[in-house]
UniProtKB/Swiss-Prot annotation:
Keyword Metal-binding belongs to the record: no
Organism lineage string: Bacteria, Pseudomonadati, Pseudomonadota, Gammaproteobacteria, Vibrionales
Key word Transferase present: yes
Pfam families membership: DsrE (PF02635)
Residues of the active site: 80 (cysteine persulfide intermediate)
SUPFAM superfamilies: DsrEFH-like (SSF75169)
Family: Belongs to the DsrE/TusD family.
GO annotations of cellular component type: sulfurtransferase complex
Gene Ontology MF annotations: sulfur carrier activity; sulfurtransferase activity
First-level EC class: transferase
Localisation per UniProt entry: Cytoplasm
Gene Ontology biological process terms in this record: tRNA wobble position uridine thiolation
Protein name: Sulfurtransferase TusD homolog
Gene that produces this protein: tusD
EC numbers, comma separated: 2.8.1.-
């Protein structure tokens, strides 16, 4: 039986293993024939969605890995808009709304309210938090 998963990532791209472990879990789930419809980045996890993260050449680029996984498997990548704004991760729409000249939300990520997380909790067979 194939299950539909949603993931919640609370850890930042670097300084914590949460995002890396969530990514590895996602790969394993997909390899077993299940699907992931949404990854919701919350609290410090929104830092995974910054286009300004520049890891060293010998380090894993977890943001790029999330982007590629999402493209290959049609997974929604959402950040909590309130948590993102507090941490300086700004989408184009929010930049315009707040009259900012720049935005730095990485390609493939969308900003959403906690309603996005609530939807995941109700729609999916499993929701796993990292």
């Amino acid at each position: 039986m194939s299950l539909v998963y949603g993931l919640v990532v609370n850890g930042p791209a670097y300084g914590s293993q949460a995002s890396r472990k969530a990514f590895q879990f996602a790969e394993a789930v997909l390899a077993q024939g299940h699907s992931i419809k949404k990854v919701f980045f919350y609290q410090e996890g929104v830092l995974n969605a910054s286009s300004l993260i520049l890891p060293a050449n010998d380090e894993v680029d977890i943001t790029k890995q999330w982007q590629e996984l999402a493209l290959r498997h049609d997974i929604e990548l959402e950040t909590c808009v309130a948590a993102a704004l507090r941490r300086g991760v700004i989408g184009e729409e929010e930049a315009s709304q707040h009259q900012l000249k720049q935005h730095n939300l990485a390609v493939g990520f969308q900003q959403a309210g906690l309603g996005g997380l609530a939807t995941a909790l109700l729609k999916f067979d499993r929701v796993v938090q990292f």
